């Protein structure tokens, strides 16, 4: 667990993530959906903090240990994925289970790890969070938000890499949006890669997803330009 790694110090972290990266490399895995760069702001947070998924409460601690993780992955040509943008460590709820509003708990310092990695060109991919913050977007949660994914992450923070959604079948999304809405909003928001884990809800086939996206492009509800941009970023 990240919290335990941070308690044992930098040398332990380096050895731990060196071994992990070696295992991934030997297994033929080229991408790790890690590290979590959420700040442990809310001690009662059941999805990040109490599970020990955060390196700490301060952005400096999170940046220090996540940098070690990313560096060990990079040495072995393994892609890292920072998550969960714009921050899930202050939430009270679990987005696996339902709608999560962080309007009154989110702090702008939760962006600090992302600012650091983007500024220093150390980030390959970023994963979105299914959290709602009316101060950032009064209508949609982050994964479906153009204001957050394009205006904030790309235009303001300068991120040029691949943006991947968290599992779109988590109940924060699937209980409030149908497949067509989810695909349309997420793609148009600036998400480049869509994640469907097929664990929490009725399985959705790749054909269903492709057919729905294609239909929405023909209906001019999904931007073809965005599809082309996503393909270029992923390639």
Show the residue positions of the predicted features.
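Active-site-proximal loop/short-helix segments
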Residues: 1, 30-52, 79-99
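A charged helix-plus-loop insertion that forms the helical arch/lid used to bind
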Residues: 1-8, 52-56
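Glycine-rich anion/phosphate-binding loops
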Residues: 7-21, 60-64, 106-108
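Glycine-rich, aromatic-flanked loop segments that form ligand/cofactor-binding clefts
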Residues: 16-40, 62-86
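Active-site loop-helix segments enriched in His/Asp/Glu that coordinate
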Residues: 45-56, 202-209
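Second-shell residues forming the walls of enzyme active-site clefts
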Residues: 63-216, 221-225
